[in-house]
Structure formats: structure tokens, C-alpha cells
Amino acid sequence: MAAPALRAPLRWSGLALGVRCAVWNLPGLTQVRGSRYAPEFREPLIDKEYYRKPVAELTEEEKYDQELKKTQFIKAAAATETSSVFADPVISKFTNMMMKGGNKVLARSLMAQTLEAVKRKQFEKYRAASAEEQATIERNPYRIFHEALKNCEPVIGLVPILKGGHFYQVPVPLADRRRRFLAMKWMITECRENKPRRTLMPEKLSHELLEAFHNRGPVIKRKHNMHKMAEANRALAHYRWW
């Protein structure tokens, strides 16, 4: 009676192996991560200017593309994508990095309050300034935000490289995406760790943005410190092989 009991697992293992081989031979049956839509679905285009363009100004390729869209499937737009004039991918990225515990509603509210606080502070400064100084005061919070982040972006960074059993901090040039990430990370870290207990996040963040806008503040100092460390370790630049 023991032989049939041993044959049953062997039969099932052989069947599982056969199914696995069949799946490998048919890649269309394999599960792909995030394959919510079939390959024939096109990406959504969220751009009002594209749809407002007159037909007479369209090229032959654009006309063909619009005719093709009438018969093709289009993916649903993400909940975070919008065609609003206030939509900004950089601010959206900063909001996602500032979010904690998946509470994006709170992160959006804090970001909106921060931009409002920046605008209020600049308008107070604008009203108190003379006619000549008013022309030099920026009041657009979106421009202030972008300029502040640009001032915080480091040009060169340090990467640990193992050489002879020791890790050396080798200076390397940073990509644009990495620069923007470090600027956002430093700004958020400064507002969280060095914020007074009774100071709200929008107030602290608006203050740091205005400081960075004028090339001042701890975030700018942190960028300069990284540049100094990279300058001090420039003798190790030959360890960079990529």
C-alpha cells in the first residue's frame, strides 16, 4: 500500500513541472507585474493645448494619430494626474516625499498652506517696500519654490567605493534627477528635525524656502559642505571607473 502513496506526489510533481514548462514556452500566459492593461492600450494624454489645436494646423502624423485614437483603447488616467493650470510635477514629487503613512490629503494641505504662507510673506514685504524695491520682489510662490530648490541642488556628490578593503568617498558628478532628490530630501529633513516644537510645518517650510530663494539657510550650507568634501577628496577621483 506504500507504493501508490509514493506515486501520487511524483505524479503531482510531474504535472506541476509540465505546467511550468508550458508557461515558459508561452510567454503570453506569464504574469507580469502591474499588467493591468493589455499591450494594445495606449497611455493617456492629459494636455489641453494638444486638444485645442485647430485641425488646420495639425500635421499628417498628428491627424493620423487622432484618427487612430478613435479605434484604440486608452488607459485610465492616474488619480494624481490633472490638466489644471496649477498642476506642477515638481511640487507633486515634493508632496509625495513629504507624505507620511500614506496620508496624501494631509501632505497636499500642508503644501498648499506653505505656498500660501510664502505668498503672504512676500506681499507683506512688497507693501512695506518702496516703489523702487517693489520691482525686485518676487511674489509668485511657484517661482520661489522652483528657484529655492534649484539653489539647493548640489552639483557634485560623494559615492562610497570599496578599494583594498576600505571604503573611499569618491567625488562624482550628479544627474539632474539626483540633484533634485537631494535638494528635496535636505529641505524636508531640515524642516522636520530642526523645527521648534510649537512651530507648524507650513510656517517652517515657507521660511526655509524663502531662505533658500535668497541663497541662505542651513540647506544651502549643507550643499556647500558637500562641495567642500568633494573638493577635499578630489585626489580619489581616479577611483571612479564608470
Swiss-Prot record:
Any one cellular-component term (Gene Ontology): mitochondrion
GO terms of molecular function: structural constituent of ribosome
Keywords, in A-Z order: Acetylation, Mitochondrion, Ribonucleoprotein, Ribosomal protein, Transit peptide
Targeting signal (transit peptide) range: 1-37
GO biological process: mitochondrial translation; translation
Major localization listed first in the record, in broad terms: mitochondrion
Cell compartment(s), UniProt: Mitochondrion
InterPro entries: Ribosomal_uS7, Ribosomal_uS7_dom, Ribosomal_uS7_dom_sf
Family: Belongs to the universal ribosomal protein uS7 family.
Subunit-level organization: Component of the mitochondrial ribosome small subunit (28S) which comprises a 12S rRNA and about 30 distinct proteins.
Name of protein: Small ribosomal subunit protein uS7m
